[in-house]
Amino acid sequence: MAMVSLSGAFRKRVLMVYLTAGDPYVDSWVIETLSEHGVDIFEFGIPTARPKYDGLTIKASYRRAIESGVTLEKSFQFIEGFRLRHKVVLTYFEYARSIGLERLMSYALNAGAEGVLLPDLLIDYSEDADVYVRLCKQYGFEPIFFITSSFPYKLISEVARLNPAFIYMGLMASTGTLLPITISRNISIIKSLINNTPLLTGFAISEPKQVLECIRAGADGVVIGSAIIRLISGGGEKQHIKEELR
């Protein structure tokens, strides 16, 4: 199968936004507003009852989606419904294994996604990484890997040699927490290990100064999720939310 490439997104610094597929607050106008105002890649989360590395905001988003009747099939119907420059799918390997990893890849391909990210893969299931890489090739995806600064340097270098679309570096242990002052140093070290592989940073970014800090340290882009979900689910007026999203 021909390879789907996200390389076009990385001709400049990248903004990737996380949204939960099927969260009642993730309406079409939210996605359209974000798309019109500079979001390069949309990362759609597949709701699961056990989002073990997410903070309270995204866990609540998953819960809303599940309680509203969202299923695996409905999640991908939601994703398929939007024509966007770039979109990827995020879910946990633990969940993907329970439904069938190949089934997940097939759904992602049919929904027009350009990759599948499994944040717990290298943390909890590193022995299955070769299966993930093989299925990515089978379905025409470049692999995407999630790492943290606590990963062994040798492993990070090995992951970069697998030619991923990008590497997503989690800055904190869970989403939505505060950034420590050592972040810039960690980003610089990781970037030196992966050479030309694009590096996106996320898990705790909510303010413009944090974005600048990551970019200055060498990141090729940032991922914002919890801050946006808090905004759209906070009960504000639609026009005010639109202005904030811009």
Each PLM stretch: what is its role?
Residues 82-126:
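Hydrophobic alpha-helical segments and helix pairs
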Residues 26-36, 102-103, 150-162, 201, ...:
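Catalytic cores of alpha/beta
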Residues 40-51, 111-125, 167-177, 204, ...:
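Glycine-rich phosphate-binding active-site loops on the catalytic face of alpha/beta enzymes
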